């Protein structure tokens, strides 16, 4: 009988915790609608073409993310310069934000390329360059929620600075929901 009473009390305790958890407010902020981020993706610069911007909100491993993306190309040749800009709203996964940005502080340089921390308009970031593949990438964290990624192919890494200037980081930081 004592075992039955103990099991009953234990079950009531678990039920009470579960009910309390159901009534607690969700403290994880919602990601923004992709339609609010797509206008932040710039138009093609002179001499370039841009594909239609795309975006979606998805549930990834129990966390929601919003991602918008646009591809750019200069010319039709096989080795033509290309660029891709993505904006990822990761506000619902602060552990991912912390782990990713924490790794940006390490600088390295080899004969194959380099990786280094950067600051863009007060925002932390990371720049990487692979010499053999002629591939440059820049990641910038905006408002502790948005990852802006620029990836260039067949361009010099200094071009990353020109591309990031085309993205209105201040306007992006103001978008909350």
Give the role of each language-model region:
Residues 7-15:
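Bacterial N-terminal signal peptides
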Residues 110, 125, 134-135, 158, ...:
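Acidic/polar, low-complexity extended loops/arms that serve as protein-protein interfaces
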Residues 23-133:
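Short, solvent-exposed recognition patches
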Residues 1-5:
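Positively charged n-region of N-terminal signal peptides that target proteins for export
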């Amino acid at each position: 009988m004592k075992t039955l009473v103990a099991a009953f009390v234990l079950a009531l305790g678990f039920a009470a915790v579960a009910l309390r958890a159901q009534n607690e407010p969700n403290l994880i902020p919602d990601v923004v609608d992709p339609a609010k981020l797509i206008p932040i993706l710039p138009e093609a610069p002179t001499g370039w073409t841009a594909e239609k911007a795309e975006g979606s909100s998805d549930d990834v491993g129990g966390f929601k993310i919003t991602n918008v993306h646009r591809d750019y190309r200069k010319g039709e040749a096989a080795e033509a310069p290309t660029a891709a800009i993505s904006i990822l709203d990761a506000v619902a996964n602060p552990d991912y934000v912390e782990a990713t940005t924490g790794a940006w502080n390490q600088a390295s340089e080899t004969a194959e390329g380099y990786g280094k921390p950067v600051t863009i308009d007060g925002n932390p970031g990371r720049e990487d360059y692979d010499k053999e593949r002629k591939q440059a990438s820049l990641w910038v964290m905006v408002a502790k929620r948005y990852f802006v990624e620029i990836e260039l192919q067949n361009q010099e890494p200094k071009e990353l600075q020109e591309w990031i200037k085309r993205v209105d980081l201040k306007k992006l930081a103001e978008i909350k929901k």
